[in-house]
């Protein structure tokens, strides 16, 4: 291998190590939500990623007895606590969010800023032809929280996204859609 190719490989390796090192969240608690529409079920998938500097605060909220172990009961309680900070309505009617799935990473991953808490909430619906307005609000988890929210492209060809509106911080989201 020529000296030029070796140099190029060294630069690529160095750039790769920088990009992976900078991928860790630092001082924010990212709460990213995707919304998946279907006529009989609306799914909200939250991916919660505490940064290195806020991980201890988040862990204290989850690990209620402070023993350094996140039990299934503590994980479930935290998921329900997150749900209390969410509001969801369809055409002005508030609908309950039901916890369907929750997965928690290892504590070491959370402390490193790479661990993602995954929560899936379902809303049972029986949507018919017509126009719909969905409103979603995430009250978050404190001043270090940042939000992202987006709707996935529907699998059902009769569902049509008409428009999405977000607040500047994306804690508030509105979606207009149509079923034909």
What are these regions (language model features)?
Residues 22-180:
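N-terminal soluble domains immediately following signal/targeting peptides that reside
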Residues 1-6:
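Positively charged n-region of N-terminal signal peptides that target proteins for export
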Residues 7-17:
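Bacterial N-terminal signal peptides
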């Amino acid at each position: 291998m020529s000296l030029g190719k070796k140099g190029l490989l060294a630069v690529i390796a160095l750039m790769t190590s920088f990009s992976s090192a900078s991928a860790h969240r630092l001082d924010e608690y990212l709460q990213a939500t995707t919304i998946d529409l279907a006529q009989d079920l609306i799914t909200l998938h939250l991916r919660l990623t505490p940064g290195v500097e806020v991980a201890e605060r988040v862990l204290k909220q989850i690990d209620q007895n402070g023993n350094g172990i996140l039990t299934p009961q503590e994980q479930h309680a935290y998921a329900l606590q997150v749900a209390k900070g969410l509001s969801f309505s369809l055409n002005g009617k508030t609908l309950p969010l039901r916890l369907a799935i929750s997965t928690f990473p290892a504590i070491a991953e959370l402390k490193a800023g790479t661990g993602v808490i995954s929560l899936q909430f379902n809303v049972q619906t029986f949507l018919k032809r017509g126009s719909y307005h969905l409103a979603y609000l995430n009250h978050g988890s404190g001043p270090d929280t940042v939000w992202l929210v987006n709707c996935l492209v529907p699998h059902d060809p009769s569902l049509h996204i008409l428009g999405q509106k977000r607040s500047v911080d994306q804690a508030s989201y509105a979606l207009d859609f149509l079923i034909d």
